[in-house]
């Protein structure tokens, strides 16, 4: 997202954080799972209805008019906390109309992660999302079943419930179901990686994806994590992915930056040099 949209997302996130914060001695906390469902539903409507999306992101329309439209469209359907978040979002400026629906989808993920935080399971959910993404990478029939646009969401939900219920945290199951049902982005594996990144960010950590041809001992992982953290100047969370195709060495990806120390890269470089 560009500057204006980043500010809009930050403002809406602050409203989400305020809505889901629980002070000591406060009554029962807001249902973060309900907020997640509401925000996702609004995002999906914006994806289906470009006229509504344009009306809610029109910088020429007064903020009061945009928030009033939200109230007319969703006021009786959304929880009060969800409505406040959407009001904040449409009151912001967005670099592109699509960014509003992307922001609401991201906030729906964060709302589910609040549920995991309350359960003390945020790290567990982050790890399960990453590992299920790797399973999809190695299981083409399963990945195809979850990305099939003709398959109803209910069918995918039943499949995922059968696979994950009792084996993964309930928040993980809901997030994987959300990734599979996402018709806006489509790529389930990429969405799971993004969800894992959002979970890491909520824990104040940055994720590095480490691809290695052979399993690494816990001692090697610890040393590698310390070295990568020093290199990037911040605390880095490692997620190790076995990939025999790189032959040896490691490939480290942090966001859009890739440090390729694989044998495959050196082999390809040597081959190119010989062919010159």
Swiss-Prot record:
Q: Superkingdom of the source?
A: Bacteria
**Name of one Pfam family that matches:** OSCP
Does Transport count among this protein's keywords?
yes
Say where the protein is mainly found: membrane
Q: Name one GO cellular component term.
A: proton-transporting ATP synthase complex
Q: What membrane topology is annotated for this entry? A: Peripheral membrane protein
NCBIfam families cross-referenced by the UniProt entry: PRK13430.1 (NF009967)
Against PANTHER family, the record matches this protein to: ATP SYNTHASE DELTA CHAIN
Role: F(1)F(0) ATP synthase produces ATP from ADP in the presence of a proton or sodium gradient. F-type ATPases consist of two structural domains, F(1) containing the extramembraneous catalytic core and F(0) containing the membrane proton channel, linked together by a central stalk and a peripheral stalk. During catalysis, ATP synthesis in the catalytic domain of F(1) is coupled via a rotary mechanism of the central stalk subunits to proton translocation. This protein is part of the stalk that links CF(0) to CF(1). It either transmits conformational changes from CF(0) to CF(1) or is implicated in proton conduction.
This protein is called: ATP synthase subunit delta
The beginning of the lineage is: Bacteria, Bacillati, Actinomycetota, Actinomycetes, Frankiales
